[in-house]
Amino acid sequence: MARKLFGTDGVRGTANTAPMTAEMALRLGAAAGRYFRRDQSAAHRVVIGKDTRLSGYMFETALTAGFTSTGMNVLLLGPIPTPAVALLTQSMRADVGVMISASHNPADDNGIKFFGPDGYKLSDAAEEEIEEILAGDIRPAQAPNIGRAKRIDDGLGRYIERAKRTFPAHLRLDGLKVVVDCANGAAYKVAPAVLWELGADVIPVGVSPNGRNINRDCGSTAPQTAAEAVVSHGADVGICLDGDADRVMILDENGELADGDQLMALFATRWAAQGLLRDNTLVATVMSNLGLEYYLNDLGLKLVRTAVGDRYVVEAMRKGGWNLGGEQSGHIVMLDHGTTGDGLMAGLQFLAEMVQQGRSASELKHSFTTVPQRLENVRFGAGQDPLAAASVKSAIAAAEAQLSGKGRLLIRKSGTEPLVRVMAECEDEAMLTSVVGEVVAAVEAAC
């Protein structure tokens, strides 16, 4: 059965609009509770975290009601980064972890994603089973077996200590001036605290959440504010997180950006030189720049590509026994340190390289020359499928013919928003602009 509710990163949409309603969240909590409580002989628990969106309170309450109605005990973490939920699911011996977040999306959106007891995101098959339970009659627990809910006060502290342990024990950040942009999101407390405890001079940005300003003109998808802060304060480096802190972008001392591809190139090179990169292999998605692939090939390193979504990167890494992967968008996965993308830990690894090598951020952030890339997003309405239109298929075929042997074209629907993403890469920038423009025009006409 194909998934209908779950996308590439859980369930996501506009709050109080189907599917992201309180009613759905209650039933989803009950369905997930029934799925994870199949062993009736043992006590069961779920940890629930959230980012700083106003609707998080509503979904937290609804999910709690759903889980407790099936007999599961709920541990509420409050606002906390997504990777912390994955960590605490493991360390607190929970059956399941839940993060309420729409990641980098605007404040009006929200989402629900699940982690298994091992701290990894659920497989497609597990999500399909939960959807099957959701579609039927969900049997509640008997009154004496209803679950309890409890707030956990030290979740942030546990994650802070774990994050610091990923930073080399013999290093400090003394003398380093660091701008950290927390996107008014889940890391607004923990990221500045970690950097300060490691000795950095911290300049916080995006640390005043009000429920409606998450990701607004800040964070990894809008790094201009942090870039201005880096330059105006004379900072050495900037770290830009997204709303749930599972992705990161780095700014050098000039306010210039390094994306996930450049970070993966740096880490892969260093790890390979130290004998730490398993099988000399990096895992990335189809969105990563061709320049990264060429760079790794020249070094004798391998690149394995997956579908878009850090969960697919992680699945490939686990299957192949590899320990480094990520996405151009800034999800960096280091399986030696955690089970999912972690923006703060990736930022710490970049700072460690600065300190160990005695080099500036600008010297480290640019490992390879990118092949010119253009990405355009086209929004479509409910029930529309512009990629099924004959005119769009014809435009795609024509574009692929033009790019044959010169570049590549990737057309896909977003798994988290109603968008068609049109991405192309080509050394000939005039051809690149023309090809993308023609495909975008065809998609827009079909919407």
From Swiss-Prot:
Record-level Gene Ontology MF annotations:
magnesium ion binding; phosphoglucosamine mutase activity; phosphomannomutase activity
- The residues that hold Mg(2+) are S103, D242, D244, D246
One cellular component (GO) term of this entry: cytosol
Which residues are catalytic? S103 (phosphoserine intermediate)
**CDD domains in alphabetical order:** GlmM
Top-level class of the enzyme under EC nomenclature: isomerase
- What cofactor does this protein call for? Mg(2+)
* Keywords assigned by UniProt, alphabetized: Isomerase, Magnesium, Metal-binding, Phosphoprotein
Phosphoserine: which positions carry it?
A: S103
What is the catalytic activity of this protein? alpha-D-glucosamine 1-phosphate = D-glucosamine 6-phosphate
Q: Relay the cofactor remark from the entry.
A: Binds 1 Mg(2+) ion per subunit.
Q: Does the keyword DNA repair apply?
A: no
Q: Which GO terms describe its biological process?
A: carbohydrate metabolic process; peptidoglycan biosynthetic process; UDP-N-acetylglucosamine biosynthetic process
Keyword Metal-binding included in the entry's annotation: yes
Matching Pfam families, A to Z?
PGM_PMM_I (PF02878), PGM_PMM_II (PF02879), PGM_PMM_III (PF02880), PGM_PMM_IV (PF00408)
The Swiss-Prot or TrEMBL record describes its family as follows: Belongs to the phosphohexose mutase family.
What name has this protein been given in UniProt?
A: Phosphoglucosamine mutase
Q: Which organism is it from?
A: Dinoroseobacter shibae (strain DSM 16493 / NCIMB 14021 / DFL 12)
The record's gene field reads glmM
